[in-house]
From Swiss-Prot:
Function: Probable component of the MCM2-7 complex (MCM complex) that may function as a DNA helicase and which is essential to undergo a single round of replication initiation and elongation per cell cycle in eukaryotic cells.
Protein name per UniProt: DNA replication licensing factor MCM5
Binding site residues for ATP: 376-383
Location of the protein in the cell: Nucleus
Any GO molecular function: ATP hydrolysis activity
Cystine bridges: none
Highest taxon of the lineage: Eukaryota
Subunit composition and interactions: Component of the minichromosome maintenance (MCM) complex, a heterotetramer composed of MCM2, MCM3, MCM4, MCM5, MCM6 and MCM7.
Every MCM domain range: 326-532
């Protein structure tokens, strides 16, 4: 411990240069003073491609932080850049000291030239690093990267509250009352507190005991510190593997700049901190984390980080967009192994490209993402479409309705085991921000869980007010959902209301709703069987063509990404006028249908559906990289809307019309028997009620029709998955 007693100057130099400089490795050819001088020269004298001084100007304007590109440092001094990469913890403090001194000299120079008073110093300057190097995989970072600069990409799933981290701790001796200040290691490291006091006792004075120090919080120096949890991007996780997480530590001006769900590219120092002392062998086991020294958010919510397209790619994309069959070609790439369903494929293509987001003058945001619901019989390739979109969309998260809770879809509040504080952890809708959420078995979700995504689908935000945390998270995502009808298969003898067990509030949020039926037709069954047999028979041969298929998927993914980043179409005047007339016409037809049938459609046609057609038109224009949506795009959007949502709303509407007098009389008799059998508030099994009325000579179809009509009049209700009937007042 004698080296500790020689003073703060020795300790400071030792902490920053344990392997070099004076008293260190004699082979080191870059000392503390020469490194400081070179950093100053770099900040003062580095010139950009246009001859300006980017870092000098950045220091004058920002005053508290400056972002330095490692490539610029490479061009200025390769040795200095290499030291930053290999020993960032030693050289970054020097870099920040140099920045503070350069800023002070620049400000005094400006004050001398202008005659104005020099503004007071705002504190130390923080250095942010940036790099164009490729990111490392989270799985490849090991002990070889310890204390070196690393660059990784991922998605933020949790953010802690801001804490105060001590940079220098003031210690007070309990015996002699002497004061000592010791530095703290940056990041999650602590302070090294000496065990003995520096005070030399006078003759006859009692010496200070061991461990006499107590911390004085009021006299210590602090900075803001926040911890983040970074998870691998979903598209980077190998099949069957759990995503890896990495703890991040951000401080000072990087605090409170990131919310859960944000996609990040992080540059930081791979470090370790002490594991819990309660664990066995904790002294030798350290937990890894990254001390962030630079981060870059995704450039666009709809793109996976800053996308760099080559000139050849851009030329190829623009040439493809000019082809007259571009729309048909794109749709043929959607689910190539799935036979038929051409309109569903076109709708999914529109979902992948999306419409244009808009921000109104009053601050209201209008979503550009398209939601599609596939409702229909089993074995109609609904889940296959969802799996294809998960692989093709630039950002996608796949989940199943039965295994998804409200917190798992939106966000949850987790209590940290060590600090016992609460922090947010984003769910599927937050993690897929800027992409697509694929929800299978949508009808199997609990109603209270399904309600949780209402706000996420329309306002594209998720509001949290739990455990003292009140915040709003972004959820700018499209939803592709697949569901089965109530009875498992779609019953053509029932109305849409009786086949679709979803509330109007959730149905109105879907732009397109397709009822996918397994139609039993000889010719079609033969063609489908032939296609499936070919797919299975060519499975072995197709393995050699997998490369071509994957290249096609990658090309489509890149093209979708390029269109979403570069093209933001708007409606032309003619298209807007045509849209207005057609929407009024559809509303008139729906009013007429409601008047004829005496009840509203199961799937409403509201202003949301008008906005859906606008988004579809913009998406069709985006596929062709055109900046204006024309009447042709509106025409195709209306055709898709008619074959999906409008047909679903009209399905089964003639079922209860034109009943013969005999059947109408039998239905009335069945209603009377049901009311006589069931008192108000009583309940009975549907199967038992039908069997009892059968024994009285009534046909089962007549009894079911009577129950259906009574349910529509709200005289009875179904419970326990429609197995139990309850008589209402």
């Amino acid at each position: 411990m004698s080296g500790w007693d020689e003073g703060a100057v020795f300790y400071s130099d030792q902490a920053q240069f344990p392997r070099g400089g004076p008293g260190g490795d004699p082979s080191a050819d870059l000392t503390r003073h020469s490194a400081l001088r070179k950093f100053k020269e770099f900040l003062r004298g580095f010139t950009g491609p246009t001859g300006d001084f980017p870092y000098r100007e950045s220091l004058v304007h920002n005053r508290d932080h400056v972002t330095v590109a490692i490539e610029d440092l490479d061009a200025f001094d390769a040795e200095l850049s290499d030291k930053i990469r290999k020993s960032p913890a030693d050289y970054l403090p020097l870099f920040e000291t140099a920045a503070s001194e350069v800023l002070a000299s620049l400000r005094s120079k400006v004050a001398g030239e202008t005659g104005e008073m020099e503004e007071p110093a705002t504190g130390d300057v923080q250095i942010f690093l940036s790099s164009k190097e490729n990111c490392l995989s989270m799985r490849s970072i090991g002990a070889d990267y310890m204390s070196k600069l690393v660059k990784i990409a991922g998605i933020t799933i949790a953010a802690s509250r801001v804490k105060a981290k001590a940079t220098h701790v003031t210690l007070l001796c309990k015996n002699c009352r002497s004061v000592k200040t010791v530095p703290c290691r940056p990041g999650l490291g602590g302070a090294i507190v000496p065990r003995s006091c520096d005070h030399v006792p006078q003759p006859g004075e009692e010496p200070c005991p061991l461990d006499p120090w107590i911390a004085v919080p009021d006299k210590s120096k602090y900075v803001d510190l926040q911890t983040l949890k970074l998870q691998e991007n979903p598209e980077d996780v190998p099949t069957g593997e759990l995503p890896r997480n990495m703890l991040l530590s951000v401080d000072r001006h990087l605090v409170q700049t990131i919310v859960p769900g944000t996609r990040l590219t992080v540059i930081g120092i791979y470090s370790v901190y002490q594991a819990s002392a309660n664990q066995k062998g904790a002294v030798g086991v350290k937990q890894p984390y990254i001390r962030v020294v630079g981060l870059e958010q995704s450039r666009d919510a709809n793109s996976n980080g800053p996308s760099n397209f080559t000139l050849d790619e851009e030329m190829e994309f623009k040439e493809f967009a000019q082809r007259p069959d571009a729309y048909v070609k794109i749709c043929s790439m959607i689910g190539p192994s799935i036979y038929g369903h051409s309109d569903v494929k076109k709708a999914i293509a529109c979902l992948l490209f999306g419409g244009s987001k808009k921000r109104l003058p009053d601050g209201v945001r209008l979503r550009g993402d398209i939601h599609v619901l596939l409702l229909g019989d089993p074995s109609t390739a609904k889940s296959q479409f969802l799996k294809f979109v998960e692989k093709t969309a630039p950002i996608a998260v796949y989940t199943s309705g039965k295994g998804s809770s409200a917190a798992g879809l939106t966000a949850s509040v987790i209590r940290d085991g060590s600090s016992r504080e609460f922090y947010l952890e984003g769910g599927a809708m937050v993690l897929a921000d800027g992409g697509v959420v694929c929800i299978d078995e949508f009808d199997k979700m609990r109603p209270e869980d399904r309600v949780a995504i209402h706000e996420a689908m329309e306002q594209q935000t998720i509001s949290i007010a739990k455990a003292g945390i009140t915040t709003v998270l972004n959820s700018r995502t499209s939803v592709l959902a697949a569901a089965n009808p109530i009875a498992g298969r779609y019953d053509d003898l029932k109305t849409a209301q009786d086949n679709i067990d979803l509330q109007t509030t959730i149905l109105s949020r879907f732009d397109l709703i397709f009822i996918v039926k397994d139609v039993r037709m000889y010719d079609q069954d033969k063609r489908i069987a032939s296609h499936i047999i070919k797919v299975h028979a060519s499975g072995a041969a197709a393995s050699s063509k997998n490369t071509d298929a994957s290249e096609g998927e990658n090309w489509l993914k890149r093209y979708i990404e390029y269109c979403r980043v570069t093209c933001k179409p708007r409606l032309s005047e003619k298209a807007a006028e045509m849209l207005q007339n057609k929407y009024v016409e559809i509303r008139q037809k729906m009013r007429q249908q409601a008047h004829e049938t005496g009840r509203a459609a199961a799937i409403p046609i509201t202003v949301r559906q008008l906005e859906a057609i606008i988004r579809l038109s913009e998406s069709l224009a985006k596929m062709r990289l055109t900046s204006v949506a024309t009447p042709e795009h509106v025409e195709e959007a209306f055709r898709l809307f008619n074959v999906s949502t409008v047909d679903a709303a009209r399905s089964g509407i003639n079922e209860h019309l034109n009943l013969s007098p005999d059947i109408a009389n039998e239905i009335k008799q069945a209603e009377a028997q049901i009311k006589r059998r069931m008192g108000i508030g009583s309940h009975i099994s549907e199967r038992r009620l039908i069997d009892e009325l059968n024994r009285m000579g009534m046909n089962e179809s007549i009894v079911r029709r009577a129950l259906l009509i009574m349910h529509q009049r709200d005289e009875v209700e179904y419970k326990r998955e429609r197995h139990v009937i309850v008589r209402k007042a």
